[in-house]
Amino acid sequence: MAQFYSPNRRVTTRKAVPAKNLTVTVASLDPFGQGVARHEGKTVFVTGVLPGEQAEVQLTEEKRQFSHAKLKRLLTPSPQRVEPPCPHFTRCGGCQQQHAEITLQQSSKTAALMRMMTRETGIELSAASLIAGTPYAYRRRARLALYFQAKEQRLLMGYRQSNSHDLVDIKACPVLRPELEALLQPLRDCLSQLSAVKRLGHVELVQAENGPLLVLRHLDPLHPADEQALRDFAQRQGVSVYLAPDAESLTCLHGEEPVYHVAGLTLAFSPRDFIQVNDAVNQQMVAQALAWLDVQSQDRILDLFCGMGNFTLPLAQRAASVVGVEGVTALVEKGRENARRNALSNVTFFHQNLEDDVTQQPWAAQGFDKILLDPARAGAAGVMEQITRLAPKRVVYVSCNATTLARDSKVLLAAGYRLANVAMLDMFPHTGHLESMALFLHDTGMRKAQ
């Protein structure tokens, strides 16, 4: 995922090496958007270069089998090199690939996904589908760090530099939805005037269907005058404002509960709930999952790691019944609320840690025609055997980590499923992050014979 600010993110500082310049020709991009070159038999990863380019680079890290380097001087530019529109690119750690044409980014990510799946499963895939939206103005959620610079007596608001704790003060961010980018300067001005300006942690911006909202993390109780200043800001800018005095609490200072739309449904969510950052790709992803599952009116469908119902509720519109299983209690409650909101009575949500033994759970004994799962980066190792025992005709696996998708795929393949389709989801353009989804089919005759 893009290296947007996270309060818990650990930063590793690489060991410095003596300055050494090389001239290399870049052969390809790695999955994270770094250029890959060879020098004296060793692989060299270079940030900021593209395939076909010749460049003078400086080594920053040396290992036995590979080195890292930074670009010093571009000797032969690629025709696929473009001018980054962001004034903070190369300093900000949020985006890594704005210098590359979007088609090159997408083809490199797709190739990386295919290589991973082939290496782990042994299956030669002919092609992967591409699901993508606009490369800019797509991000409907971001978290920005806040830091009061005592020497300059000013508030910094922005993202971390790559591989650094240093904060880049952001004046523009073209990957943000325009409604959120337009808030950057007025929000900075407002926060700078608060008496608590030295005790602010971060601010989250979210673009909901019913308007933008912000969540302000403050380290001390706010003075009533500060709260009133935030209310005035909210009214002037037409935003909802939430206060977060700690990691658990959340108070609405002004505005209404946010909602988003998917597959013609309206889903309410808490500002801290997980929703997909890229709305356009989420819409296409849900539509593709429904098409791959080939949902019929008589189907019973299981949705694992279901969240608040991003897939569950669109499935329930089409199937006879749907069961959603999720490990976060608040999301289960929100899923039930959203089912009621959309008048869907054929869906049942269960709270269950899917990393535990699930065989004794009431939903695990039910029969299902089709299964969808959308786990976190760790994958779904704990439930893959249970999925094969349920023997659904179709399985759609949505993944934010191609490595665990490939690993878990082997369980399905060993049980007689075949990998019928793979798609690369460009959820985060200009970053090294890719998401993916895969369709597995089980031949009925083979299943009966087992």
From Swiss-Prot:
Record-annotated TRAM domain positions: 15-73
GO biological process: rRNA base methylation
Domain of life: Bacteria
Catalysed reactions, as listed in the record: uridine(1939) in 23S rRNA + S-adenosyl-L-methionine = 5-methyluridine(1939) in 23S rRNA + S-adenosyl-L-homocysteine + H(+)
GO MF term set: 4 iron, 4 sulfur cluster binding; iron ion binding; RNA binding; rRNA (uridine-C5-)-methyltransferase activity
Chain residues that bind [4Fe-4S] cluster: C86, C92, C95, C173
Binding residue positions for S-adenosyl-L-methionine: Q276, F305, N310, E326, N353, D374
One Pfam family cited in the UniProt record for this chain: tRNA_U5-meth_tr
The protein's Enzyme Commission number: 2.1.1.190
Residue numbers annotated as active site: C400
UniProt keywords, alphabetically: 4Fe-4S, Iron, Iron-sulfur, Metal-binding, Methyltransferase, rRNA processing, S-adenosyl-L-methionine, Transferase
CDD domains documented for this protein: AdoMet_MTases (cd02440)
Cross-referenced PANTHER family: 23S RRNA (URACIL(1939)-C(5))-METHYLTRANSFERASE RLMD, RNA M5U METHYLTRANSFERASE
Summary of the function given for this chain in its UniProt record: Catalyzes the formation of 5-methyl-uridine at position 1939 (m5U1939) in 23S rRNA.
Protein family (similarity comment): Belongs to the class I-like SAM-binding methyltransferase superfamily. RNA M5U methyltransferase family. RlmD subfamily.
Protein name: 23S rRNA (uracil(1939)-C(5))-methyltransferase RlmD
Annotated source species: Pectobacterium atrosepticum (strain SCRI 1043 / ATCC BAA-672)
